[in-house]
Amino acid sequence: MNANVSKLLNEQINKEFYSAYLYLDFANYYASVGLDGFENWYRVQAQEERDHAMLFYQYLQNNGEGVTFEAIAKPEWERDDHMTPLKKALAHERLITAGIDAIYAAAYDVRDFRTMQMLDWFIKEQGEEEKNAADLITKMELFGGDSKGLYMLNSELEARVYTAPSMTCLLYTSPSPRDA
């Protein structure tokens, strides 16, 4: 694997773990203000992000690449209202998308088709992530100012359940340098 592609994939692992950390912080905030549905939404989101990190980890391992773990930064944000985490989440998802796009571009430059194929799943996933974050902002803008609307939105978010991702492209690996 190209050294730059491997480096970018390693960096993405850290970004995904940071995402999980950030979303757990959002979940903690919402739990502290009694919005259990919002807490559930972001707790599930944190699980997804952790799994995304593990998918990148497994892809690197399957391809004989080393994995380097960096420190996870403390999330910094103002806990001033219920909308702040929602807007911060959308901005963050856009940053994650940009990171995945950068890996794809680097893989394209060196004709690393296997990595490009693996990233196709993440590109689609990021489209979903950004849409979900934007939709949540829209719903909060529509209903969040009304206590009944906020209650209904909170109840809707409480119903979200975690589903682990599955990526069959991780089953296909190149020979490990250890096998050479």
Model-inferred region functions:
Residues 8-12, 20-24, 97-101:
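A structural feature that tracks compact, well-ordered secondary-structure segments
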Residues 2, 31, 98-124, 138-151:
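Acidic interhelical loop/turn segments
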Residues 14-17, 43, 47-54, 87, ...:
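Generic structural signal for well-ordered, non-transmembrane alpha-helical segments
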Residues 143-171:
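Short terminal interaction segments
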Residues 30-71, 133-136:
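Conserved alpha-helical segments that form or flank metal/cofactor-binding pockets of metalloenzymes
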Residues 1-6, 71-91:
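Acidic/His metal-coordination segments adjacent to aromatic residues that form catalytic metal sites
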Residues 172-180:
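Single conserved hydrophobic/aromatic residue that forms the stacking wall/gate
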Residues 62-72, 99-101, 110-112:
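Short, flexible active-site-proximal loops enriched in glycine and acidic residues
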